[in-house]
Amino acid sequence: GLTGVVAELDTGRPGKTLAFRFDIDGVDVTESKDEAHRPFKEGFRADIDGITHACGHDGHITIGLAMAKLIAQNLDDFKGKFRFIFQTAEEGTRGAVPMEQAGVLDGVDYLLGGHIGFQAKTSGGIICGTNKLLATSKFDVNFTGRSAHAAGAPQEGANALLAAAQAALAMHGITRHADGVTRINVGVLRAGEGRNVIAPNGYIACETRGETTELNEFMFQKCMDIVAGVAQMYGVQYDVKLTGGTSGGDSSEEITDIYERAARQSPFIKDELIVRDLNFGACEDFAHFMHAVQKAGGKSGYLMIGTKLAAGHHNGAFDFDESALLSGTDVFLRSAYAINGKDA
């Protein structure tokens, strides 16, 4: 992505290449103007309606910049190389794949990442190892039929509205898989031009998810079978456009161990709020990075940083406890010392 940034610090001493990933994009939400909303009250509400940081990625940017500054200021304490990946387009799972293809993970031995909030809902808490990040495919289907007079010559038409509707219903009827979690959702259906016109166009926006990459592929292929069958049934053409996607993933045990030790040493984390590992049950395209690093023989892990939230993720009133910035930075920095400290 053109808005992504990658920076590297080289100590000049032999060691591992340790990368950190921080997602930086906003979401399509208008931020609250309620007087009780702290960002509005204190004058740092989003400037543009319809787009805001309602998922905590501004916090991730802050942690990433703090990490880069602290490691640069204390470079003599370290060995090896540090790479800071500020990733665009996590929302919609569109950013990791092109950045990985651009080579941002080349030579990486360890990759660390995480997120503010989600299941870590208490300030001072942490989830050290996040597992079962779901694989997903995001795709649009356009059906192209043929318009005709609905009463005078319906036989001359090819109804793309019915094709889109039939596809949506059939996709939601796909048999789930016994090997793990699978999901399907058709979130948008648009079609037609007029009440007395056979609809020449139909559009659906869809996503599949699976506990593993293989389970997601099972769901996606079933959807493709349905699209092809429905198109033949109604005599329409179709076009499928992949708009995003990511692999599934589990944190490496070694990274979970490192995070847990760092959390127990941190003055910003409460021991009773440390959770060793938890299944995520949702999608995050860090999983693509994680899978790529692990496939190449490296280690990767994803943590969740505890914070009290004013409202849920992707809500216009979203706000987090800024003590999470200290917690996240401290755990990542201690993990950096554990992996690439001079005495590690």
Which residue ranges define each predicted feature?
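A non-catalytic alpha/beta surface segment that caps or lines the substrate-entry region
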Residues: 1-14
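Histidine/acidic-residue-rich, glycine-tolerant segments that coordinate divalent metal ions
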Residues: 5-6, 27-29, 40-41, 45-52, ...
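Structural motif
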Residues: 15-17, 136-138, 298-302
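Short, solvent-exposed beta-strand-terminating loops
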Residues: 25-35
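DPxDG-like acidic metal-binding loop motif
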Residues: 61-68
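Metal-dependent amide/peptide-bond hydrolase catalytic core
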Residues: 161-344
